[in-house]
Amino acid sequence: TEIGIQIEQPDRPGGVLFDNMTALDNLCTSLIPKAGQHIIRKKIVSSILSEALRWFPKEMLLQPLSSWSYPERLRFSYYRWYLLNPRLLICFFPFAGQESTHHKMIIDLLVLCAQRGMAVWIISSGIDAICEKTDNEEFLRRLHYLNK
């Protein structure tokens, strides 16, 4: 995957998540085509599940995303990009409409993506206010502004 696009609210209709599918099925739908045809599907699903268990309880992964809370779904959408590992992740207004308690989670996940080697672009207004609230030094160090 060359480019990933994280929209403002990934769980809205037409977003990047499939509500009626389980979280595990959402991940498999995204990752199995990337794995290629040489790997057995059952082995891929097992690998995806074992990696996802580091982030989410198994019970949650086997439930439809429609049963998850909004913060959980938001975290899952960023986690999906973490696994897909595109070269560039473009995030459109990731903090807009979010409770301030979600800002830290989003920032931490974006830093994890950057540590994995992704270039992360944040297209947003009000980023100064976000920077004032965060204590994530790596996020602040990696942040570069383009103002026009």
Q: What role is predicted for each listed range?
A:
Residues 91-96, 101:
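Walker B catalytic motif
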Residues 130-132:
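A short, surface-exposed alpha-helical micro-motif characterized by mixed small hydrophobic
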Residues 1-35:
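ABC ATPase nucleotide-binding domain signature region
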Residues 51-70, 85:
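Conserved ABC nucleotide-binding domain
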Residues 103-116:
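Helical segment within the ABC ATPase nucleotide-binding domain
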Residues 33-51:
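Short coil-to-helix "N-cap" segments within the ABC nucleotide-binding domain's helical subdomain
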Residues 123-125:
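H-loop/switch region of ABC-family ATPase nucleotide-binding domains
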Residues 71-91:
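GG-anchored amphipathic helix commonly corresponding to the ABC/SMC/Rad50 NBD signature/C-loop
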